[in-house]
């Protein structure tokens, strides 16, 4: 796996799924391929994106700044600086300075990532802030190691919280989760459908599922009533894909 592929993988792992994630993936690919060289426009676009947390925007802004060639005097962006200040906690800043000194001695991406993984997310963000604000310089490889370590920590905590939700025994949360998943699956079916005869069938199934979820939410139903709803939908989606000769395992 190339360095940039690895960076893209880690950064995208902390972006919530949805159309915006696809857009960000495209922007990252363009930047890494040298196709997008207007850093100013890129940062303006990033600043106005909804849904993303300030820290995620800060990390993306840091990656764009590292990758896109720009004039030396280009102004640093406030939204990135604010996100990478370690919540203003002096402890984070102290640890960030210690980490920075260690990173200065590293020359490889993996070496930097290993060193960084033993620090808290706040300290890692502060260290990125130091580099972003030109208070310190490290090689691009080392900076990317720092980025990936930060993303790994964030993704780990997101995964833990996701696992807690999936394994919860609270029937109301499980019920709502099934309905949300059914809705997003229906949306995916509608987006994939296109305009063939089978597509009309897929649209019909998706539409019925959405109406059902809407009705369940409106009138309130027993928490077990949604069991199997997403599975039925996925079964329909896979049958439709088979007929269309499409194999999309990623919906599982």
Swiss-Prot record:
Annotated keywords: Host nucleus, Membrane, RNA-binding, Viral matrix protein, Virion
Subcellular location(s) of the protein: Virion membrane; Host nucleus
GO terms of biological process kind: viral budding from plasma membrane
GO molecular function: RNA binding; structural constituent of virion
One Pfam family hit: Flu_M1_C
This protein's record includes keyword Glycosyltransferase: no
Record motif Nuclear localization signal, residues: 101-105
Region (Membrane-binding) residue spans: 1-164
UniProt membrane topology term: Peripheral membrane protein
Domain of life: Viruses
GO CC terms: host cell nucleus; membrane; virion membrane
Disulfide bond positions: none
Role: Plays critical roles in virus replication, from virus entry and uncoating to assembly and budding of the virus particle. M1 binding to ribonucleocapsids (RNPs) in nucleus seems to inhibit viral transcription. Interaction of viral NEP with M1-RNP is thought to promote nuclear export of the complex, which is targeted to the virion assembly site at the apical plasma membrane in polarized epithelial cells. Interactions with NA and HA may bring M1, a non-raft-associated protein, into lipid rafts. Forms a continuous shell on the inner side of the lipid bilayer in virion, where it binds the RNP. Determines the virion's shape: spherical or filamentous. Clinical isolates of influenza are characterized by the presence of significant proportion of filamentous virions, whereas after multiple passage on eggs or cell culture, virions have only spherical morphology. Filamentous virions are thought to be important to infect neighboring cells, and spherical virions more suited to spread through aerosol between hosts organisms.
Quaternary state and interactors: Homodimer and homomultimer. Interacts with NEP. Binds ribonucleocapsid by both interacting with genomic RNA and NP protein. May interact with HA and NA. Cannot bind NP without genomic RNA.
Family to which this protein belongs: Belongs to the influenza viruses Matrix protein M1 family.
Protein name: Matrix protein 1
Native organism: Influenza A virus (strain A/Turkey/Ireland/1378/1983 H5N8)
């Amino acid at each position: 796996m190339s360095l940039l592929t690895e960076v893209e993988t880690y950064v995208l792992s902390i972006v919530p799924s949805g159309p915006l994630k696809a857009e960000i993936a495209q922007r990252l690919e363009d930047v890494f391929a040298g196709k997008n060289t207007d850093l100013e426009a890129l940062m303006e676009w990033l600043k106005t994106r909804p849904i993303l947390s300030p820290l995620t925007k800060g990390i993306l802004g840091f990656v764009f700044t590292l990758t896109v060639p720009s004039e030396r005097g280009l102004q640093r962006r406030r939204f990135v600086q604010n996100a990478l200040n370690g919540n203003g906690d002096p402890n984070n800043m102290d640890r960030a300075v210690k980490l920075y000194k260690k990173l200065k001695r590293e020359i490889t991406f993996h070496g930097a990532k290993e060193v960084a993984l033993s620090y808290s997310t706040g300290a890692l963000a502060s260290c990125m802030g130091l580099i972003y604000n030109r208070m310190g310089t490290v090689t691009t490889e080392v900076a990317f190691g720092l980025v990936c370590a930060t993303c790994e920590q964030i993704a780990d905590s997101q995964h833990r919280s996701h696992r807690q939700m999936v394994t919860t025994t609270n029937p109301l949360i499980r019920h709502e989760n099934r309905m949300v998943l059914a809705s997003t699956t229906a949306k995916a079916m509608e987006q994939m459908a296109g305009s063939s005869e089978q597509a009309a069938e897929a649209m019909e199934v998706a539409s019925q599922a959405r109406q059902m979820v809407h009705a369940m939410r409106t009138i309130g139903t027993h928490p077990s009533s949604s069991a199997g709803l997403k599975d039925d939908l996925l079964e329909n989606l896979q049958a439709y894909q088979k007929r269309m000769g499409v194999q999309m395992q990623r919906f599982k």
